[in-house]
């Protein structure tokens, strides 16, 4: 069995971007003799993976940035002493990159428990293809451990949906930009696990706990940092990786305010498995001045973020976060409400979202900044941590090049020029992605599904379900620009990763239907492997029971006011006046459910997920979908809500058996 497919093309073919950027599919059953026709064309057996890693390391070791042994006699060489303020993701990744290149590194971290337990506070983090590739270029073994611990989301459907209806607005293809460039596929990983792996790779002897950098002095030859307890340490350069409220930044450029995004964010992790877990990785649910993000994080858990437009500094009532969220998102689709309901109150956290405006000044002298300390961005693209990882690789590379030039020329290491070179190489890319993250928030805050939303006295127009012009026009531009944007964000830094061999992993392969799912919403729904239920939703005092529908095409569900045990299928009795003796039949075919009205007196009615109510045609199968309301009769007493669940509650199965007992 092939475990790794290597990308041998130096210049991958240019993608033909269409309305949907479609993935290149690699199936486990794909004939091995045809692999030469794919971008990723060479393969190795499992036992050769270690050799491959050795090749990557050897390539890095032979790069021009390495000091030739003969040059050591020409110029006395000593390790550069690199001081790093901050032991978050950016600080640790840079420390690892610098250590791998032979530098003497010391990381100052205010609270080592933040490294061990930050994941408990902020939850999992998405590491996209561009950052995973940078990690591979830094240390293949560490990157492999991190990827193995993550949950792959990039080979499933991801994108934007309408928050109320749950209908797809735009799908993102993060798979194609990765495999076409030989990059790892996007993953989500526990922040705590990520930082533990990084801290272990860096080494506890390099990370100083309870060491908060409060000041520094750059005399032109050395940099001396001062800790909160008065201790001082001297090095050849200082890297400020101490977050959005960086003390290093403040000492460099003076105090400056962070920028409030206009949104507060609630976040939580729920023990919950959505019905479409096999086909959908993450979704952004759009609404007017509020939006909701959900992502599979593996292990039967889902992470979510709820953003709401309001002033900063708000405080919730004790144990009131969940109740407030359910009120804010009242009327939204099941995918949102189910996650909120499944989350414990004490697992919900709240924080206001801030960023910093882009700046042209990243450092001075022997001091530079990295990650959030210089370009803190809103989380809407999931690129904040990814940019810090890219920064880390580039900074270590520039320092290594400076050391190599020093060895070749016999001159002192030009640290200052190498820091400015790092900053120049990163400013444009980071600035563009920072702007895109802000634009994503603006789009979310201005999204309106229907004409009349947010218009106060004219809000009655929403009942006519007239699509808002902004939604229609916005979709056109998103469909046009999203493939280009994703291609550049995910693959635009790959050429700078010196020594990294482009490759794909068969373990990251996509379902062979992924191409179809991007184009066909109906095919995506039919692929859902879950149980379909009808939950009582009527205004009757009758004890209606939950119905579990069968996906056996030979086992229809016959609904009437009396039992029909002599008819094939299950008989469901609803003893209400407007339910006819033989009212309707529910059947399953080709991955979808249909209801057929059997010429009942008062009809069978369906209200879809956008609020449109219509009568099913007699003796004609009518398709229904998740979240629809089905009414047997016109008085809304025998009404049921269509619910699709991965694991239906045990009570539902019990009630279903009672409902069909005699049948």
UniProtKB/Swiss-Prot annotation:
It comes from the Eukaryota. The gene is ABA2. FAD binds at residues 81-109, 359-372. Residues 547-611 form the FHA domain. GO terms for biological process: abscisic acid biosynthetic process. It is found in: Plastid, Chloroplast membrane; Plastid, Chloroplast thylakoid membrane. Converts zeaxanthin into antheraxanthin and subsequently violaxanthin. Involved in the epoxidation of zeaxanthin. Plays an important role in resistance to stresses, seed development and dormancy. The lineage of its organism: Eukaryota, Viridiplantae, Streptophyta, Embryophyta, Tracheophyta. GO terms for cellular component: chloroplast membrane; chloroplast thylakoid membrane. Induction: By drought stress; in roots. One of its GO terms (molecular function) is FAD binding. Residues 1-50 form a transit peptide. This is Zeaxanthin epoxidase, chloroplastic. Its EC number is 1.14.15.21. It catalyses: all-trans-zeaxanthin + 4 reduced [2Fe-2S]-[ferredoxin] + 2 O2 + 4 H(+) = all-trans-violaxanthin + 4 oxidized [2Fe-2S]-[ferredoxin] + 2 H2O. It holds the Pfam family FAD_binding_3. Keywords: Abscisic acid biosynthesis, Chloroplast, FAD, Flavoprotein, Membrane, Oxidoreductase, Plastid, Stress response, Thylakoid, Transit peptide.
């Amino acid at each position: 069995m092939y475990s790794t497919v290597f990308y041998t093309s130096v210049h991958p073919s240019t993608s033909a971007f269409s309305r949907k950027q479609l993935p290149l599919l690699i199936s486990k059953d794909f004939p091995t003799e045809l692999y030469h026709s794919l971008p990723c064309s060479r393969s190795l057996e499992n036992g050769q993976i270690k050799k491959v890693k050795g090749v990557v390391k050897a390539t890095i070791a032979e790069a021009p940035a390495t000091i030739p042994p003969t040059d050591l006699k020409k110029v006395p060489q000593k390790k550069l002493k690199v001081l790093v303020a901050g032991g978050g993701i950016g600080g640790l990744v840079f420390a690892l990159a610098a250590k791998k290149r032979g530098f003497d590194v010391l990381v100052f971290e205010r609270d080592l428990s933040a490294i061990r337990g930050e994941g408990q506070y902020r939850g999992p983090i998405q590491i996209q293809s561009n950052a995973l590739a940078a990690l591979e270029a830094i240390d293949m073994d560490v990157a492999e451990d991190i990827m193995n611990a993550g949950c792959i989301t990039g080979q499933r459907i991801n994108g934007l949906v309408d928050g109320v209806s749950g209908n797809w607005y735009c799908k993102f293809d993060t798979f194609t930009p990765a495999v076409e460039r030989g990059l790892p596929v996007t993953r989500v990983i526990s922040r705590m696990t990520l930082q533990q792996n990084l801290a272990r790779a860096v080494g506890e002897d390099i990370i100083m706990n309870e060491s908060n950098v409060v000041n520094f002095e750059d005399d032109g030859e050395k940099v001396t940092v001062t800790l909160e307890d008065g201790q001082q340490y001297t090095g050849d350069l200082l890297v400020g990786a101490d977050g959005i409220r960086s003390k290093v930044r403040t000492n460099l450029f003076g105090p400056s305010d962070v920028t409030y995004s206009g949104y507060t964010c609630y976040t939580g992790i729920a023990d919950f498995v959505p019905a479409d877990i096999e086909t959908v990785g993450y979704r952004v649910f759009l609404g007017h001045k509020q939006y909701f993000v959900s992502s599979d994080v593996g292990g039967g858990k889902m992470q979510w973020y709820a953003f709401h437009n309001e002033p900063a500094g708000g405080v919730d009532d004790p144990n009131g976060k969940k109740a407030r969220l359910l009120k804010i998102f009242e009327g939204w689709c099941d995918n949102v409400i189910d996650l909120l309901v499944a989350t414990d109150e004490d697992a919900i956290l709240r924080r206001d979202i801030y960023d910093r405006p882009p700046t042209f000044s990243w450092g001075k002298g022997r001091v530079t900044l990295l990650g959030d300390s210089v370009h803190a961005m809103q989380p809407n693209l999931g690129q904040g941590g990814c940019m810090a990882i890219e920064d880390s690789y580039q900074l270590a590379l520039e320092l290594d090049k400076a050391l190599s030039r020093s060895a070749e020329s016999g001159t002192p290491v030009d640290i200052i020029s190498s820091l400015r070179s790092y900053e120049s190489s990163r400013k444009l890319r980071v600035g563009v992605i920072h702007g895109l993250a802000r634009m994503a928030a603006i789009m979310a805050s201005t999204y309106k599904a229907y004409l009349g939303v947010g218009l106060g006295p004219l809000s009655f127009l929403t009942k006519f379900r007239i699509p808002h012009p902004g939604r229609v026009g916005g979709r056109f531009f998103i469909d046009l620009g999203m493939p280009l944007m994703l291609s550049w964000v995910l693959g635009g830094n790959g050429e700078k990763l010196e020594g990294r061999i482009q490759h794909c992993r068969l373990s990251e392969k996509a379902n062979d239907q992924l191409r179809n799912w991007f184009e066909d919403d109906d095919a995506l729904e039919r692929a859902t492997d879950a149980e379909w239920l009808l939950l009582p939703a009527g205004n009757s005092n009758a004890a209606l029971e939950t119905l579990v529908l069968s996906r056996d095409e030979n086992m229809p569900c016959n609904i009437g006011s009396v039992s029909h045990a002599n008819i094939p299928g299950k008989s469901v009795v609803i003893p209400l006046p407007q339910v006819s003796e033989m009212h309707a039949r529910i059947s399953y075919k080709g991955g979808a459910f249909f209801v057929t009205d059997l010429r009942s007196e008062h009809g069978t009615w369906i209200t879809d997920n956008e609020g449109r109510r219509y009568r099913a045609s007699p003796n004609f199968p009518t398709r229904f979908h998740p979240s629809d309301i089905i009414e047997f009769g016109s008085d809304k007493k025998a009404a049921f809500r269509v619910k699709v669940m991965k694991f239906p509650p045990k009570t539902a199965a019990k009630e279903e058996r009672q409902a069909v007992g005699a049948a």
